[in-house]
Every structure is written in C-alpha cells, then in structure tokens.
Amino acid sequence: MKIDVLTLFPEMFQSPFEESIFKRATDNNLVRLEIYNFRDFAHDKHHAVDDSPYGGGAGMLLKPEPLFEAVEDVLREDPTPAPIILLSPQGRSFNQEVARELAKHERLIIICGHYEGFDERVREHLATDEISIGDFVLTGGELAAMVVIDAVSRLIPGVLGSGESSQDDSHSNGLLEHPHYTRPPVFRGWGIPDVLLSGNHAQINRWRRKESLRRTLKRRPDMFEKIPLSKTDRKLVDEILAEENAQG
C-alpha cells in the first residue's frame, strides 16, 4: 500500500514511522509512506496557506488553492486511484471496521487539517471521505493521521508477520481481547488461571472466548449489543451472568 500524507508539519511523521513494525513494513516494501508539505503549493511571497473567514469569526481557515494543487500534483506523479481522506471532527467515526475498509485500497491520500478548519470547497469538491478519530479537539490532523496509518497498516498481509496477530487484536472480531499472562506463573502471590497451564487447547480456547465475552460485556456494552452470538457464545454468556450474580 502507498500512503500519501499532505501536512504542514512533515517532520512530525519521521520518528513514529522509523521504528518497530512500520519500519519493517516499509523495509519489506509492504507499505510506502510519502509526506508532502502543502505549503510548497502556496505561490504568494509569504507562502500563506490560511486566511480569515468571510463573514468574520475567530481563527483562520486553510485556503483551497494549496490543497487542490498539492493533491493534483500527487496524482500527476502517480495516477493510481485513491480515496482522498480529510481528517476532521466532522467526519465519520474511525473504528476497526473502517480500518479494514481502508486496508483494502492499494493507496490512500490523507489530508491533515490545521487552524480553524478548511474552506468548505475542500470538503465538497476535493475530499472523497472524511474521518474523525474521536469527539475531542486536536491542534492539527497529524496525530489523527498517525492513528489511521498505524491501524490500517497492521491489517496489510505480512506487516505483523503472523496472520493471527491482527485477527486476535481487540475490536478485530467485535470483541475486546481476553486477558494475557506470561512467566512467571506466580508473581507477588498472584497466580494465573489453571486452564492456561493445562495444555488442553480446546479448554484454553473456550476460556479465552468466554473472557473476551465477559470483558466486552462489562467494559463495552455498546459493542456487545452488536455482536452476533452463536449458541456456544450464549451458553458462555449464561455462565458469565451466573458467576457475576453469585459474586453479588
């Protein structure tokens, strides 16, 4: 996958993507990240990319010309089709389902906002998608872009090195992940569930599924309501509810 990012702060993307899993992905040509400073497409002597809003009001808006020219230049350089994603608090909510959707594309173009927002013509006539990572305010779209890039890249075959890794992540199947334990088996008097030491993989898988259901039910009931439960899942949920009731 190729990911083109348009930003006013290209330096912000250097360190996070030169480490760990993403670096291995780029070294293995699984992901290619290209960063563009759209200030380079502002042609006045001050290279201004923002201006005050018509009608008055606080803050400055990003002008349409530099962004349109930047995207057009990127597409001239490589005409591979791509969704043009605007990162904005007005966009659709980003989640694992959206990450899976984006991971199917051969290429993404991501626009990072700044200041008070965009001239509306960017939203209406340039962007093909608009995404928000949450109901809070950030200084710019760069951190949001990093979140999207990281979540999407993990889903590209070969990036994690194991097909099971991304499938087992929290949210990947609609459930929060089950608890994990490693050595030592007892730490400061705290042990681990006996089933994990049993060697019985069927029982271990059952325990993991049950604890995934339990954790999602308790911590994210909004997610739990959307999960299609099998007969086995329903039986496990009945056990969970009985155990919770017994504990008071």
UniProtKB/Swiss-Prot annotation:
Top enzyme class: transferase
Keyword Chaperone recorded: no
Sorted UniProt keywords: Cytoplasm, Methyltransferase, S-adenosyl-L-methionine, Transferase, tRNA processing
Catalysed conversion reaction: guanosine(37) in tRNA + S-adenosyl-L-methionine = N(1)-methylguanosine(37) in tRNA + S-adenosyl-L-homocysteine + H(+)
Molecular functions (GO terms): tRNA (guanine(37)-N1)-methyltransferase activity
GO biological process, one term: tRNA N1-guanine methylation
Residues reported in the UniProt entry to bind S-adenosyl-L-methionine: 113, 133-138
Gene3D superfamilies attached to this UniProt entry: 3.40.1280.10, tRNA(m1g37)methyltransferase, domain 2
Disulfide bonds: none
Stored HAMAP family: TrmD
Subunit architecture: Homodimer.
UniProt family annotation: Belongs to the RNA methyltransferase TrmD family.
Function comment: Specifically methylates guanosine-37 in various tRNAs.
Annotated protein name in UniProt: tRNA (guanine-N(1)-)-methyltransferase
Taxonomic source organism: Dehalococcoides mccartyi (strain CBDB1)
